[in-house]
Design a protein with these regions (language model features):
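A glycine- and small-aliphatic-rich helix-loop capping segment at beta-alpha/alpha-beta transitions
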Residues: 130-135, 157-165, 214-215, 245-251
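PLP-dependent aminotransferase-class I/II
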Residues: 146-203, 207-215
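Glycine-rich loop-to-alpha-helix module at the N-terminal edge of alpha/beta enzyme cores
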Residues: 53-138, 142
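Active-site-adjacent loop/helix segments that line or gate small-molecule/cofactor pockets in enzymes
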Residues: 2-42
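Hydrophobic "anchor" residues on beta-strands that sit immediately upstream
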Residues: 52, 196, 228-230
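Surface-exposed amphipathic alpha-helices with a cationic face
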Residues: 130, 216-226
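Active-site and channel-lining beta-strand-loop segments
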Residues: 35-58
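Conserved PLP phosphate-binding loop immediately N-terminal to the Schiff-base lysine helix
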Residues: 200-213, 227-250
Length: 251
């Protein structure tokens, strides 16, 4: 945007069509966007540049569990922004340690890895699983049909949706998929080269399926070879789906 256009936008309200037109010229078309331009959010409501209110059932793709601009969250962000915004992961800082201690205390975890996105977490889990299996030359990873793990190359390769993987050429080797509600099908796919099985305890994009066959529980106990592991990924349908902090805690 040129400087004069920026000043013009600040001085004169733009119409919805004008904002959409300008956005479509400069933003990548990696997703299909609705022709809505939001200016603010309060609680469960989003408000457009033209003042129309929309009840938000999407929640930032199921992450705004406290709603928009929750007063306590807003104050906490403001206070931290006045103290410290970023140091890198080469140092400790107080909120980082306090949050990690809380997560270890309240969940199944022994240690915490903080990341910027879900796909980054999956990439780290892929590397960890292969590192874990390296001594026995076990590098294969088994995903489940209908799953979604992210759009970076490793996470995309693990995703069990053909349409997501189309158009990018050959994916890295070592990835395969089994039906979600078929434990015997999972067992048939496991081989001596399997390093890990990736399971969404609640299949998000696959229809909110929580495993009618008890697949997540059974898979977490599956150890066909010495040192096999399961990677259980938190679903993207929001936390506390079963009234506990993480559905993984019940597995």
């Amino acid at each position: 945007m040129r400087k004069d256009e920026t000043m013009e936008a600040a001085a004169k309200p733009l119409s919805l069509k004008e904002w959409v037109s300008r956005g479509s010229r400069v933003l990548m078309g990696n997703v299909t966007r609705e022709e809505l331009v939001f200016r603010k959010g309060r609680g469960s409501w989003l408000y457009t540049t033209e003042g129309d209110g929309y009840l938000d059932f999407l929640g930032g793709v199921a992450i705004h569990v406290l709603g928009h601009c929750h007063p306590k969250v807003t104050v906490a962000v403001q206070k931290q922004a006045q103290r410290l915004l970023h140091t890198s992961n080469l140092y400790y800082h107080e909120p980082q340690i306090l949050l990690a201690e809380f997560l270890v205390r309240e969940t199944f975890a022994d240690r915490v890895f903080f990341a910027n996105s879900g796909t980054e977490v999956v990439e780290a889990a892929i590397k960890l699983a292969r590192r874990f299996g390296a001594a026995a030359e076990r590098f294969d990873l088994l995903g489940l049909e209908g799953s979604f793990h992210g759009r970076t190359l490793g996470a995309l390769s693990l995703t069990g949706q053909k349409k997501i993987r189309e158009g990018i050429g050959p994916i890295p080797e070592g990835f395969s998929w089994a039906p979600y509600n078929d434990f015997e099908g999972v067992v048939r796919k496991v081989s001596p080269r399997t390093a890990a099985i990736f399971v969404e305890p609640v299949l998000g994009e696959g229809g909110g399926d929580s495993g009618r066959s008890g697949l997540p529980e059974k898979t977490s106990d599956l150890h066909p070879g010495q040192g096999d592991s399961s990677c259980l990924r938190r679903d993207s349908d929001g936390d506390c789906p079963y009234g506990i902090a993480f559905c993984l805690s019940g597995l």
